[in-house]
Amino acid sequence: DMVMESDRSEFVIVYGRRRVGKTFLVDQYYQGSYDFTFVGGHNLSRQRQLTSFGKALKKFSGSKPDKFSDWFDAFDALEEYLELLDADRKKVVFIDEMPWIDTQKSDFVSALENFWNGWAARRSDIVFIASGSATSWMVDNLIENQGGLHARITSSIYVRPFTLHEVEEYLQRKHCKWDRYQILQCYMVMGGIPFYLSLIDPRQSLVQNVDRLFFSHGGIMRGEFDELYNALFSNAELYISVVKALAQHHDGMTRTEISKVIGANGGTLTRVLTNLERCDFISRSQNFGCKTKDTIYRLMDFYTL
C-alpha cells in the first residue's frame, strides 16, 4: 500500500529462487490489474524478446505493434503508451523473469537505466516492478548496480521458501491428514518450495506422492533438477558438479577441496560459489580464528539434497 500511495515513482524488485512464488505474490496483490506486463522468455534471442515485448504492448495499448530495433526503442514506446493514461493514478508496470531478457549484448540494462532515470523517476505516478529467479543477476544488475541504476531501487522483496511450520500450515489448508513425521519428511524432500507443495495430492501418502511426482513416467518433478539449474545459471553443468560434490560431504568442503573435485578455480569458482550462496543452495561458515581459505561450504537446499 505504501508503494501505491507514495508521492514518487517506485522501483520495486521481487527476487528469490525459481518456483518460490514471486509471480504469484505480485499477481495476488495487484489482482492482475497491470497497465503493462511482460514476461521474459528463456533462451530467446534479443529480437524475439523484442517482438514479444511489442505484442504485449499491443495487447495493452490496442495499437499496432512496432518493430523495435533495440531496447531503447521498446522503452520509448512504453513511455508513449503510459503517458496516454490517466495522470491522476499510479500506473503499474510488471516485468517478470527480467534476467532472461538481458541476453548477450542486448543493451537491455542500459535502456532500463535510461527509461527509469530519464523518464519514470522524474514523475510521481509509476510503479515499476521487476522480478526474476536468477538472484545473482538481480543483485548485480539492480540491487548492487554501480552504474545508472545505483541506489535507484526504492523497495525490494526477497521471497524465501516456506519454513517447516509454514509447510505444516499449508498442508493443513490442503486438508492433508499426514502426521508430523510425514510433514517433516515432505519438507526434507520438497524444501518448502510452494510450487512443489502445490503438486501434492492430499488423498495419497507421502510415499505415493513422491513416487508419482518423481519416479513415474511423465512425473512432473522427474526432470526438475536439470531444468532448475539450467534456468538459473549459464554453464549449469559446473554448478551441478559443485552441488553434487557437496552432497557427498555432509560436513562440508573447503574451496580447495571443491576445486580439486570439479577442476575449476580462480574467478570461475568464486562466481559459482557466490551465485549458489545467493540462491540459498549453499551456505558458508568459518570457524573462529581460521583463515578465509578454510571457509566451509555446505549444501543447504533440501530439494537438491
Identify the role of each PLM range.
Residues 1-7:
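Pre-Walker A adenine-sensing motif
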Residues 7-12, 34:
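Pre-Walker A (Motif I) flank of P-loop NTPase domains
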Residues 12-15, 19, 100-104, 108, ...:
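Sensor-1/coupling segment of RecA-like P-loop NTPase cores
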Residues 22:
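Conserved lysine of the Walker
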Residues 25:
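Hydrophobic positions on the alpha1 helix immediately C-terminal to the Walker A/P-loop
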Residues 32-66, 79-80:
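Conserved NTP-binding/hydrolysis module of P-loop NTPases
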Residues 154-182:
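Conserved small helical "lid"/interfacial subdomain of P-loop NTPases
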Residues 195-196, 200-305:
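Accessory nucleic acid-recognition modules appended to NTPase machines
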